[in-house]
């Protein structure tokens, strides 16, 4: 009964002690250490561990299923555990009580195996993270094998990527020399190996054979057939490969060396060689610094500004500007140098070229193209720069030129089948693919690719959407295009191409409509840089992760507002 003048109180009050569950687990842990109230014993060999069923069932899925589903063990006072390390089981029982676990190099594998058996996914993930963060050329092959055995897909992929990135160092390890033939064959055949030259792959394979010459000598022909000997220097083939005693005494090996030498001596025979043996390797999982070159400001003026993006730190930093302002510029990276090619300076289309050395932070003029051009596609294949199409101030171009850094000369090669300006151009599976673009009258969805061995162009499946001023890049076994302009609107849509199916399919669109966008691959992801959304130039950047099929905004450019050329210089030094 409430008296007159007294404050009316609610009939229901909720009271709680938030720390009670965690405090209760601590008390139960202490009781277990005293050996009191325990109702089950887990046995491994001569080791026995007492515990409480209720705690094990609450914390460990394996025991939850055992004790709540009327399994035979739920009535046993002592349960025999098979296939686990005793110290790992003890650590996981302690974890069930206090939520703490110490992971180190000595126990990580046994803990991961135990966690997998007991269905403790969070601990399994923590162990995988521990191993992934400590990958090294001396242990990565063993970690990969362990990850495969334990069906840890993320760790397996991380170890695989590490092996590809650090192949030269890995090939010098004891783990590599102890690999079975099947694993070595699989490894030396990978496109993703990060090597400065194919000669490093040859030396790795030969070292593996010589480690057990008597047993492995007969495997050399099979190994050499999976190495891209035609991509070795002629001098190396003659002075090193051909002179090796293991090669000289094997007829099949000598035939492979002759085939490689013919590649250099008789170019007309190149189309008849197995395609994979003449396809350069490309390690797309390496992190690289992304350079944004030239472009436009908000007033539409061409810029000479250059800035560099670190995708790991997610930050931009300004570096030395070019000697010439260039928008719609072609950008290529060869031998650690960044080339700015052609473009538009605000008054004229340019044929001039300059190269940036990041080690000295300097720009140097190099040989000019034969034609003035802006809005062309620029790629690198077999150490040569190719520029495709573009606009010379009067019309769209079909012409193609290639530049040799060794001779500092440009050479005209076979023209495309169509005049194409603002097309997407990328190297994919050893061929130059040109997608979309326009000829001044119409915008294309068509695609063609160039075989540099035969100097011929061939059609490929057209994109689902016609587009020009879009970004194009390859990543792994797929080719991607994004953004652009279709004649009526600015695009955010993106597509992916598979050469096996010769077919395009849509992927998730970007968050922003982007015409004049540049697309570049780094560290296994794609970066869409800048562009124009129909109202203003863009400084924003989006990153696409093919594993999640998601675009994520990254740090925006600091000094640019769209229309930039981009190039990526790998961070990893071989």
Swiss-Prot record:
Q: Which GO terms describe its biological process?
A: cell division; positive regulation of mitotic cell cycle phase transition; proteasome-mediated ubiquitin-dependent protein catabolic process; protein ubiquitination
Disulphide bonds in the chain:
none
Question: Per the record's keyword annotation, is Cell cycle included, yes or no?
Answer: yes
GO CC terms on record? Cul3-RING ubiquitin ligase complex; cytoplasm
Q: Does the keyword RNA-binding apply?
A: no
Name the domain of life this protein comes from. Answer: Eukaryota
Q: Name one GO molecular function term.
A: ubiquitin-like ligase-substrate adaptor activity
Q: Where are the Kelch repeats?
A: 289-336, 337-383, 384-430, 432-477, 479-524, 525-571
Q: Which UniProt keywords are given for this protein, alphabetically ordered?
A: Cell cycle, Cell division, Kelch repeat, Mitosis, Repeat, Ubl conjugation pathway
SMART domains xref list? BACK (SM00875), BTB (SM00225), Kelch (SM00612)
Pfam families reported for this sequence? BACK, BTB, Kelch_1, Kelch_KLHDC2_KLHL20_DRC7
Domain BACK residues, every copy: 140-242
Q: Name all BTB domain ranges.
A: 66-105
Pathway assignment reads: Protein modification; protein ubiquitination
- Role noted for this protein: Substrate-specific adapter of a BCR (BTB-CUL3-RBX1) E3 ubiquitin-protein ligase complex required for mitotic progression and cytokinesis. The BCR(KLHL18) E3 ubiquitin ligase complex mediates the ubiquitination of AURKA leading to its activation at the centrosome which is required for initiating mitotic entry. Regulates light-and dark-dependent alpha-transducin localization changes in rod photoreceptors through UNC119 ubiquitination and degradation. Preferentially ubiquitinates the unphosphorylated form of UNC119 over the phosphorylated form.
Subunit arrangement? Answer: Interacts with AURKA. Interacts (via BTB domain) with CUL3. Interacts (via kelch repeats) with UNC119.
Q: What is this protein called?
A: Kelch-like protein 18
